[in-house]
C-alpha cells in the first residue's frame, strides 16, 4: 500500500489582493505525491512553480485550501515548524553552506539541525565522520577525501551537490529542489543532476524538482507536471512520460491551454 507524503488540496494564493497589482499565483492547485515519487515541475515565469514550493515550506501563507506533509496538516504552521519535515535546495550554490567551515562541519550542522546540543560533544565524532565519508562517495565528486577542506574552496557544482546531500541527512518527508542547477554551467549542472538521481534513489526520497529545462524535466523523475497561470495543467507519468519528447510536451501544452508555449520562458534543450 502506497504512503502519501504530500497532499495539496485546492490551494489558492494571491499577492496584493484587492489592488490593481493583484496577482493570482496559485489558482486551485491540487497535487498528491506518494512515497518515492520524483516529480519534475516545468512552466514559464509566473506559472506558480516557486510559489507552490514556498507554500509547501510555509514561506508564504496560503489564502485557502490545505497542505499535508506525511501525517501532518501543515496548513497553518509557520516555516520553522515545518523545517523538520522538509529538505530544500535553492538556486544559488553559495546559500546552502557556510564557506568558512569545513565540509564535515557543515554536514554535522545539517545533521544536528533542530536537535538539542550537548556542550560536551565534540565537533564531529568518528562515527559521524565515517558516515559522512560514505554518503559523499555517492556524489562521485571526490569530496569524501576532503572532509576537512573549507567549503569556500569548492566549485559551485561541488557546493550545490554538498548542499543537496546536507538537505537529505535527516531523511525529510519531502525534498524541494528550486531550480537547483539553474546557476551552473551545462556540464556542471549535468553532474549535479546525476548526483541528485543517486541521492534520491538511494533513500527513496519523495522529491519535487523545479527546472527551467524541458529536457531535464523529461529525463529525470517518474512524473512530470506542468504549471501555467497558477494551475497544474499537465500531470504525466509512467510509460507516457518514458516516451515523452519536448515536441510532445509542447503539443500537450497547446492542447490543454489553447495557446502556444513561449519558447523564451524555458530552455527547450
Model-derived regions, located:
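A short, flexible loop at the N-terminus of ABC-type nucleotide-binding domains that lies
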Residues: 2-5, 14-28, 78
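ABC ATPase NBD coupling module
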Residues: 19, 73-87, 95, 118-125, ...
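The feature captures the beta-strand-to-loop junction immediately N-terminal to the Walker
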Residues: 42-44
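Helix-to-loop junction immediately C-terminal to a conserved catalytic motif
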Residues: 57
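Conserved ABC transporter NBD signature motif
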Residues: 65-73, 234-236
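ABC ATPase C-loop
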Residues: 167-168
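H-loop/switch region of ABC-family ATPase nucleotide-binding domains
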Residues: 211-212
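Conserved beta-strand-loop-alpha-helix hinge in the C-terminal portion
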Residues: 231-257
Amino acid at each position: 500500500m502506497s504512503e502519501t507524503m504530500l497532499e495539496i488540496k485546492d490551494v489558492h494564493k494571491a499577492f496584493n489582493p484587492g489592488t490593481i497589482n493583484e496577482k493570482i499565483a496559485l489558482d486551485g492547485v491540487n497535487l498528491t505525491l506518494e512515497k518515492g515519487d520524483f516529480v519534475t515541475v516545468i512552466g514559464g515565469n509566473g506559472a506558480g512553480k516557486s510559489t507552490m514550493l514556498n507554500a509547501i515550506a510555509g514561506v508564504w501563507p496560503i489564502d485557502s485550501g490545505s497542505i499535508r506533509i506525511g501525517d501532518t496538516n501543515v496548513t497553518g504552521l509557520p516555516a520553522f515548524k515545518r523545517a523538520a519535515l522538509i529538505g530544500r535546495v535553492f538556486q544559488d550554490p553559495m546559500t546552502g553552506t557556510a564557506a568558512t567551515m569545513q565540509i564535515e562541519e557543515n554536514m554535522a550542522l545539517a545533521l544536528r539541525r533542530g536537535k538539542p546540543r550537548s556542550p560536551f560533544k565534540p565537533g564531529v565524532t568518528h562515527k559521524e565522520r565515517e558516515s559522512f565519508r560514505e554518503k559523499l562517495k555517492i556524489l562521485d565528486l571526490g569530496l569524501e577525501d576532503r572532509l576537512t577542506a573549507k567549503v569556500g574552496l569548492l566549485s559551485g557544482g561541488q557546493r550545490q551537490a554538498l548542499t543537496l546531500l546536507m538537505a537529505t541527512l535527516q531523511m525529510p518527508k519531502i525534498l524541494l529542489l528550486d531550480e537547483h542547477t539553474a546557476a551552473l554551467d551545462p556540464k556542471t549542472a549535468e553532474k549535479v543532476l546525476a548526483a541528485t538521481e543517486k541521492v534520491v534513489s538511494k533513500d527513496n526520497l519523495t522529491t519535487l524538482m523545479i527546472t527551467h529545462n524541458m529536457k531535464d524535466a523529461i529525463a529525470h523523475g517518474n512524473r512530470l507536471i506542468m504549471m501555467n497561470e497558477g494551475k497544474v495543467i499537465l500531470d504525466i507519468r509512467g510509460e507516457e512520460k518514458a516516451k515523452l519528447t519536448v515536441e510532445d510536451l509542447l503539443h500537450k501544452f497547446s492542447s490543454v491551454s489553447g495557446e502556444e508555449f513561449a519558447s523564451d520562458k524555458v530552455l527547450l534543450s
